[in-house]
Regions:
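Non-ligating segments of multi-cofactor redox enzymes
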Residues: 1-156
Length: 156
């Protein structure tokens, strides 16, 4: 299983700092100067329910449904991370429908469709920007293999 980002709803305050950190981390110049409502394209989304808030992001599925349904194979696995090859994406939204976690979205930027999903900030040596920016530490990068081993040790 692949590592992915998980949110603790008990700690999430719905501040959307994770979304801003994601947008900035995926901009070419890594600053807020070019962010506008039209270009605010986060790969993590804060969802607000009646009694809780939590962040939703890609679970990096082993057999990713989003990749399976893409008619142009725009979603490919690189070094254990599912990524979107934007040049290939046709904006059909099949990936959005197929994702069981609601973690995919297709947006339009300058008349071009872009499919967005979390890539765990693979371009950052320090790891996911959202995890680093969360003021309440509600986000963490979960490695299912490590978690399973810890649970087995705890039971022993």
């Amino acid at each position: 299983m692949n590592p992915y980002i998980v949110a603790d709803p008990a700690k999430c305050i719905g501040c959307r700092t994770c979304e801003v950190a994601c947008v900035v981390a995926h901009q070419e110049d890594q600053s807020c100067t070019m962010v506008s409502p039209a270009t605010f394209a986060s790969r993590i989304r804060v969802m607000k329910g009646a009694t809780f808030t939590t962040a939703v992001t890609c679970h990096q599925c082993e057999e990713a449904p989003c990749a399976s349904v893409c008619p142009v194979q725009a979603i490919q696995r690189e070094a254990g991370i599912w990524r979107v090859e934007q040049q290939r994406c046709i904006g059909c939204k099949s990936c959005v429908i197929a994702c069981p976690f609601g973690a995919m979205q297709v947006i339009r930027v300058n008349e071009r469709a872009l499919a967005l999903k979390c890539d765990r900030c693979a371009h950052r040596e320090s790891g996911p920007a959202c995890v680093a920016a969360c003021p309440t530490h509600a986000l963490r990068c979960l490695d299912p293999v490590t978690l399973r081993a810890a649970r087995l040790r705890a039971r022993a």
